[in-house]
Amino acid sequence: MNPVEEMLAQAPYLRLDAELTVELLTRALREEVEKTGFRKVILGVSGGIDSALALFLCARAFGPEGVLAVCMPYRESSPDSLKDAREAVEVVGVESVTVDITPQIDAYFAGFPDASPLRRGNKMARERMSILYDL
């Protein structure tokens, strides 16, 4: 038995009906977006599992034509992350754009050269949020 099977044997309540879970999540997404009056969603895609799952669920909920995926790398971002993000976009078949955040981030931190990596990471997250709102 592999570790996941062992865990599920000890805690059977962790088992999920994948089809039902996807149906419930996509229905919830549609209902919440419809409340806003929007018919299309914009989603930041990083190449990680969280954004890949969100991308899959949004494509299921709104159809590929109802999703815009946005990749927002920084010059020090892992090339593999951008590659993974682009692969996820290709698999689900949605429209995508890439916005390089390097110019904005570097210009901002030129005034704060001693900023910690945590502070830089937080600024990048806020910059990405601003870009998503502006699209």
Language-model regions: role of each:
Residues 1-135:
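ATP-dependent adenylation/nucleotidyltransferase module used to activate substrates
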